[in-house]
């Protein structure tokens, strides 16, 4: 046909059999990618330290999605929570990957079959014998089936009635595990951080989809609406399908970036707003105050802080710190975390407790400034020592560690104090192994950042695709000169004047 590359989909425009074939092949590719990617991630994933080297630090992308749906065990004998497993069963990480690859093969064969046997009687009108598809009825079938699937997921899988439940954790990502979820039918169900809303919304949306599907199967659209929305044109289906996809992509980009019950911190890493708002820092402060009210010493209080919570309060885990074009996992940036050094408390020679101002998200460099509890600047690491008034040396700043590996250790040497002051800008201080992966010290984003960027970008592209194909189908008569009220199926090139009712039945003969 000599079609340019951007027009090749024209070949399936009026060919339902091969339209099915290409969709089957596309689904085969998606399923095959998911299974293959899962096997690759399992080959490189190190499950030995779920606290300081979790899946999101290692750049895992598909493993978190399997985990949030209830998969936690591996045929390799490990569990995502750190326990040893003897019998992982069929629904392990490897089992799910294998099922996707087998499904991909079956879909591949089905695609070939439908490409070869494309002209089925199913696609022909019984009365006329001409190719035709009842698109409103097909829409009703799809709506009904997707409604059944949606309802079943919410009513059975998420609730644990017939399934494992989903990953549920506390707001600070410390106690996560897979468990059944009770549907939340009140106002709390609309809170994006309440897991019960996932169950109730899938149940409600599923029922709505089932009812809407039955409606579209039993009620025909009015003729004016049918023609006005071009319901007989398969490009209308394409346009509305793209709309559904781009809307879903925008929604999940938002729930991933801003956080939700469906995107737990333990599986995808913290959000940037948790650093901006000092979310984990405030919880740590609350716990320290609670411990001090029980007459525990500062050292004992900080020793009770979970290392997992302290690690969240570190800017290197902020997905917005990694540039979009810095490829690789977080571990390839600042390294593999091996231990918490403890909480650094700075004091000047007058006894004021000093706090290092933390680096905002979108700064690569930031002045080291130490303030007291009233926000008054007491010390800094100056850019120009000749004009300094508050340098560590002049003010006599010391640092002491509470909790962690350096618990009880103090330093008064200015060079050491300045080193830890610079590191305290980045939150809690950790020791990193940069040799194993040859980490370059430049922050990377987490899968949360990559997912958001990818889905927001493709949602925008698909939005324009929806506008494009919607305009093509709505204004087809304007673009091609075909009257939208023309009932007869037009065969291109067989008429003296395209779409002219007076010439549509004219027979052109050749005299030999």
Swiss-Prot record:
Binds multiple chlorophylls. PSII binds additional chlorophylls, carotenoids and specific lipids. The keyword Thylakoid applies. It holds the Pfam family PSII. It is a multi-pass membrane protein. One of its GO terms (molecular function) is chlorophyll binding. It is found in: Plastid, Chloroplast thylakoid membrane. The chain crosses the membrane at residues 21-36, 101-115, 140-156, 203-218, 237-252, 457-472. GO terms for cellular component: chloroplast thylakoid membrane; photosystem II. InterPro entries: PS_antenna-like, PS_II_antenna-like_sf, PSII_PsbB. The keyword Thylakoid applies. Keywords: Chlorophyll, Chloroplast, Chromophore, Membrane, Photosynthesis, Photosystem II, Plastid, Thylakoid, Transmembrane, Transmembrane helix. It comes from the Eukaryota. GO terms for biological process: photosynthetic electron transport in photosystem II. SUPFAM superfamilies: Photosystem II antenna protein-like (SSF161077). Its main location: plastid. One of the components of the core complex of photosystem II (PSII). It binds chlorophyll and helps catalyze the primary light-induced photochemical processes of PSII. PSII is a light-driven water:plastoquinone oxidoreductase, using light energy to abstract electrons from H(2)O, generating O(2) and a proton gradient subsequently used for ATP formation. PSII is composed of 1 copy each of membrane proteins PsbA, PsbB, PsbC, PsbD, PsbE, PsbF, PsbH, PsbI, PsbJ, PsbK, PsbL, PsbM, PsbT, PsbX, PsbY, PsbZ, Psb30/Ycf12, at least 3 peripheral proteins of the oxygen-evolving complex and a large number of cofactors. It forms dimeric complexes. HAMAP family: PSII_PsbB_CP47. Belongs to the PsbB/PsbC family. PsbB subfamily. This is Photosystem II CP47 reaction center protein. It comes from Physcomitrium patens (Spreading-leaved earth moss).
């Amino acid at each position: 046909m000599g079609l340019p590359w951007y027009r090749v989909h024209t070949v399936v425009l009026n060919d339902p059999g091969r339209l099915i074939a290409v969709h089957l092949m596309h689904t085969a590719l998606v399923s095959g990618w998911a299974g293959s990617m899962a096997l690759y991630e399992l080959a490189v994933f190190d499950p030995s330290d779920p606290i300081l080297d979790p899946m999101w630090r290692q750049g895992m992308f598909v493993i978190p999605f399997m985990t949030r749906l209830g998969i936690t065990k591996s045929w390799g004998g490990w569990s995502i929570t750190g326990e040893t497993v003897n019998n992982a069963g069929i629904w392990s990480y490897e089992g799910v990957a294998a099922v996707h690859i087998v499904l991909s093969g079956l879909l591949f064969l089905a695609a070939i079959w439908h490409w070869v046997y494309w002209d089925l009687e199913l696609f022909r009108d019984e009365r006329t014998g001409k190719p035709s598809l009842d698109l409103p009825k097909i829409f009703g079938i799809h709506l009904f089936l997707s409604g059944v699937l949606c309802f079943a997921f919410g009513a059975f899988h998420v609730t644990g009635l017939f399934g494992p439940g989903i990953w549920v954790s506390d707001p600070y990502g410390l106690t996560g595990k897979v468990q059944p979820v009770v549907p939340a039918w009140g106002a709390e169900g609309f809170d994006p951080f309440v897991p019960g809303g996932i169950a109730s919304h899938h149940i409600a949306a599923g029922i709505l989809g089932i009812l809407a599907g039955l409606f579209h199967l039993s009620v025909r659209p009015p003729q004016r609406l049918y023609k006005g929305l071009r319901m007989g044109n398969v490009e209308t289906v394409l346009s509305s399908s793209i709309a559904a996809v781009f809307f879903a992509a925008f929604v999940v980009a938002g729930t991933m970036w801003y956080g939700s019950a469906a995107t737990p911190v333990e599986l995808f890493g913290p959000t940037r707003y948790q650093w901006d708002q000092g979310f984990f820092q405030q919880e740590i402060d609350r716990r320290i105050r609670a411990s001090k009210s029980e007459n525990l010493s500062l050292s004992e209080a900080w020793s009770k802080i979970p290392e997992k919570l302290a690690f969240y309060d570190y800017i290197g885990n902020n997905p917005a710190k990694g540039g979009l074009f810095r490829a690789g996992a977080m571990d390839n940036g600042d390294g593999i975390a091996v231990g918490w050094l403890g909480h650094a408390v700075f004091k000047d020679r007058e006894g004021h407790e000093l706090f290092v101002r933390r680096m905002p998200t979108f700064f690569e460099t930031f002045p080291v400034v130490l303030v007291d509890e009233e926000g008054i600047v007491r010390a800094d690491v100056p850019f120009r020592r000749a004009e300094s008034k508050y340098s560590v040396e002049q003010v006599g700043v010391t640092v002491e560690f509470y909790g962690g590996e350096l618990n009880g250790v103090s330093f008064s040497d200015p060079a050491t104090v300045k080193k830890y002051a610079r590191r305290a800008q980045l939150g809690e201080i950790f020791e990193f192994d940069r040799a194993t992966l040859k980490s370059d010290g430049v922050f990377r984003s987490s899968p949360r950042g990559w997912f958001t960027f990818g889905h927001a970008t493709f949602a925008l592209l698909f939005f324009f695709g929806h506008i494009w194909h919607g305009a093509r189908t709505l204004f087809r008569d304007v673009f091609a000169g075909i009257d939208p009220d023309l009932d007869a199926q037009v065969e291109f090139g067989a008429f003296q004047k395209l779409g002219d009712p007076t010439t549509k039945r004219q027979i052109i003969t050749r005299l030999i």
